[in-house]
From Swiss-Prot:
It comes from Clostridium botulinum (strain Hall / ATCC 3502 / NCTC 13319 / Type A). Homododecamer. This is 3-dehydroquinate dehydratase. Pathway: Metabolic intermediate biosynthesis; chorismate biosynthesis; chorismate from D-erythrose 4-phosphate and phosphoenolpyruvate: step 3/7. It catalyses: 3-dehydroquinate = 3-dehydroshikimate + H2O.
């Protein structure tokens, strides 16, 4: 069985309430349910982790290598400046795909740069919750099933 960890960063626990014109009305719990439902017929276990604390995200990334085949991460605001999360992502030997619900390139200037993208295989941005599904599909079709 393949194991994938989905990590969500700060304020994503506020989805459904926070800036619905940008992020929509869907909650993080609804997103997690949609992901699980989409992959219900796969030989796949998906775990979800959300934290507003940088250190907890770093710890989760570092310990993930022991248990997971890959990570899908939405670092949220940390993507724009967290060298510590970037370094944690670089320190592990499993693939990481970065996801953003909104199109960061259509947002404020300071949101258009993702430092964490440097340690990601790729970045999926602007497709809402479906970006997570796209990331997991990529992982399954191009990385995990090839082994």
């Amino acid at each position: 069985m393949n194991n994938i960890l989905v990590i969500n960063g700060p304020n994503l626990n506020l989805l459904g309430k926070r800036e619905p014109d940008i992020y929509g009305n869907i909650t993080l719990e609804n997103i997690n349910q949609k992901i699980k439902l989409h992959f219900k017929n796969e030989d796949l276990k998906i775990d979800f982790f959300q934290s507003n604390e940088e250190g907890k995200i770093i710890d989760k990334i570092i310990e993930s290598e022991k248990k997971y085949n890959a990570i899908v991460i939405n670092p949220a605001a940390y993507s724009h400046y967290s060298i510590a999360i970037l370094d944690a992502m670089r320190s592990i030997n499993i693939p990481v795909v970065e996801v953003h619900l909104s199109n960061i390139y259509k947002r404020e200037e300071y949101r258009k740069k993702s430092v964490t993208a440097e340690a990601s295989l790729g970045v999926i941005s602007g497709f809402g919750y479906y970006g997570y599904i796209m990331a997991i599909e990529f992982i399954l079709n191009n990385l995990v099933r090839e082994r």
